[in-house]
Amino acid sequence: MEKIISRNRAGWVFFIFVFLLVIGTLFVVTKTPYNFSFDPLPQKIHAIKLGNHITFSGENVPVEYFDVAERLDRELLLNTYQHSSTILNLKLCRRFFPTIEQIFREEGVPEDLKYLAIAESSLRNAVSSSGAKGFWQFRELAASEFGLEINDFIDERNHFEKSTRAAAKYLTKLNSRFGSWTLAAAAYNMGPTALQSAMNEQKENNYYDLNLSEETNRYVFRILAIKEIMKDPERFGYFLTEDDLYEPLNKYEIVEVDSTLNSLADFAHQNNITYRQLKLYNPWLLKSNLPVKPGRIYKISIPK
């Protein structure tokens, strides 16, 4: 009997010891500076207030209609609160927009259409699942139509200046066909034949009255949302300084090449740059060599 009582006492002592240990641990945790706080977060999430008068490439956006207003509101919310992508786009604007603006002025394309490049590729040489490439997401057939060279060694869809010029010419052609820059943007996304077919079937000639695919239904609104944020980022909570923005890649000289380069690495080193620098400034060069046909001249950018 005494042994049983002794064992019971030992059990109670052990239980009390464990209980006190747990209580002590909890007390220490509550005092640690790493304890979770349930204080309100020091930020506020706001809805987006739409302006009463919004235009796209000089054409009115009928935000007085609830359907149009809500479609734009959706894209504004998505782009405003997609923080990392929006910040990267803001940083890249200073690098690429001046060149786009200059080429568009020369080709008579409204400046608002520069935001199409963000909607298409986020200002990068992207590759889509359908095979579209570059800043302007040209497919091979359209690229060739507007003078971009594509072969095993070269893809000028990745040539920023040339592809921007081609995009401007394509948009101008679409505007001539549809009589509207808004419809031109929609046609750029879904293709002119498909857009014309939808317009004929629905007997409508205004983008905002058309019922198109989900992607094209959202496309112009996405460009509009990007435009609103990019032109006044502080209104949407983005406060970037000049030092935050990426520098333009405009300090380079042009070297004309009229004969085959068996090694682009050797060519780079001969011009006192690295192979990587050569590729960064000339992403249209696909391989490590460049065959050049007689009479052909390629202009390669060499950073200073």
Language-model-detected regions and their locations in the chain:
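Solvent-exposed, acidic/flexible segments
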Residues: 86-97, 106-109, 128-136, 156-164, ...
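Catalytic cores of secreted or luminal carbohydrate-active enzymes
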Residues: 214-237
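Extracellular LysM carbohydrate-binding repeats and other cell-envelope/extracellular binding modules
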Residues: 279-304
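Catalytic and binding regions of secreted/periplasmic enzymes and modules that target cell-wall glycans
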Residues: 171-198
